[in-house]
Each structure stands twice: as C-alpha cells, then as structure tokens.
Amino acid sequence: MDRLSYAIGDKAVLNNIRVQFQPGSVTALLGPNGAGKSTLLKALCQEIPSAQGSIKLGHCQLVDWPRAELAKSLAVLPQHASLTFPFTVDEVVAMGLYPLTLSQKEGQQLVTKWLAEVGVLHLARRSYPTLSGGEKQRVQLARVLTQLSQSPFPPILLLDEPTSALDLAQQHKVLALAKNLAHKHAYTVIVVLHDLNQAARYSDRVIVLKQGEIVSEGTPNDALSIDIIRQVWDYEPEFIPAPQGDYPLIF
C-alpha cells in the first residue's frame, strides 16, 4: 500500500498511508472512532474506487484484478454475522465455495475441513440462526476460509471489529483462531480492534491511526507507548506489570 489517500469533501479520511502487510502475521489496526481503520479495510477490498495511491497484491495492482479472482485471495469477516434465513451451518460455510471451481465432493471436504479447524464441526447440521454469537462468528470464519482455499497468494483475511458483539470468552476464542491461522497457514491477517490489550496479546504488529494518518507502527511493545496512548486516546494509561515476556495490561 503506497501513498493511499482518500477524502470526503474537504475532510481527509486517509492521508498518505504507506504500509506493507506480511504473510504469516497478524496486524492490528488501532485508533479512536473516525481514525480511518475501517476505511483502510474498505480500500483493501476495492470498495473505495475514488481513493488515490496504489495497493498491490504480489506484483499486481489490486485495481486490475477481476472481482471474482480477488475473492479467492482476499476476504472479510464482518463485524456482525447476521443471517436470518434457516440455513444449516454447513450450508452457510458452503457459500464460500462460490468463487471456486471444485467438484461437489471436493467442496464438501473443504467445508468439513474448515468447520473442524475452527471447532464447530459438531454443529454442521444445526440451524444457523439458533447459534450463539461466538458460534456464528466461527461459522462465518469457516465460510471465508473456504472462500480463500484456492488463493494463488498467501490469503488475506480482514477482520473488522470481529469481537465487538461477543462476550469475553468468545472474543478470545475468535482472536486466538485468527492468530493460529496466520502462524500455521501463512495467512495475512489484518484486524480492526479497540481493545489495546487484545491487540497486544494477539497481534504481531500494531498500526495506530489518528485522523487518517499512521502515528505509530511496530510490535505492540514499541507501538503502544505511554506517549502514543496519551496522544491518540487522550487519557493517562496505567500499566500493570505482567510475567516476563508478556505485554503489561493497560487500563
């Protein structure tokens, strides 16, 4: 991503963003409301055609990719996994087969593989609307992983506040799954979060945005300094020491 900028009228939403995302790692996008986090994800999905600058996947400009081909390499896990139709869980996951060219048997094997990977294979024949919020989010994760199964590049998984509607236990399960996917399967995972402690625990790299600009970038220890937290979130943080090697809790 090079010199990416986007404005609505006179208001700069993204300003000269230059960043590279690495396969096999989790990058957390942090910042207050209106900082440009979700807009950055939309730009990656080619949902902002008027944005200036360039975004490349491999050596190719993302804008030159046919949408059906891009869908094989890049997918979004939405903030709210809302489906009201009475599909079964395996039918929801099978929706991810849409951009792929597979036989029925191969498709079913993929659905089973990813349901097992995210820990909900036992729910395969359950009606999707009857699931809990955390179960729905894991089913949706299995769906997008199915979609990315034929990617010619290390797949890119975008998570836009994926834990905002979940209880604490489910939040940690979803983020732990995302981190495992990055490290085990070489996915490029980019996640929008508001919780600094979750970002510190589950990301390899943090990008802090304020008013559409990157103000800090690096490992959680480097990027989330006291000065940055004061500058971006305008409050005095309290750090509680953690065991050696762990990131301290921030309050």
Swiss-Prot record:
InterPro entries: AAA+_ATPase, ABC_transporter-like_ATP-bd, ABC_transporter-like_CS, P-loop_NTPase. SUPFAM superfamilies: P-loop containing nucleoside triphosphate hydrolases. It is an enzyme of class 7 (translocase). It comes from the Bacteria. Keywords: ATP-binding, Cell inner membrane, Cell membrane, Membrane, Nucleotide-binding, Translocase, Transport. It is a peripheral membrane protein. Its EC number is 7.6.2.-. One of its GO terms (cellular component) is plasma membrane. ATP binds at residues 31-38. Its main location: membrane. Gene3D superfamilies: P-loop containing nucleotide triphosphate hydrolases. GO terms for molecular function: ATP binding; ATP hydrolysis activity. It holds the Pfam family ABC_tran. The keyword Translocase applies. It is found in: Cell inner membrane. Part of the ABC transporter complex HmuTUV involved in hemin import. Responsible for energy coupling to the transport system. NCBIfam families: PRK13548.1. PANTHER family: HEMIN IMPORT ATP-BINDING PROTEIN HMUV. The complex is composed of two ATP-binding proteins (HmuV), two transmembrane proteins (HmuU) and a solute-binding protein (HmuT). Belongs to the ABC transporter superfamily. Heme (hemin) importer (TC 3.A.1.14.5) family. This is Hemin import ATP-binding protein HmuV. The lineage of its organism: Bacteria, Pseudomonadati, Pseudomonadota, Gammaproteobacteria, Alteromonadales.
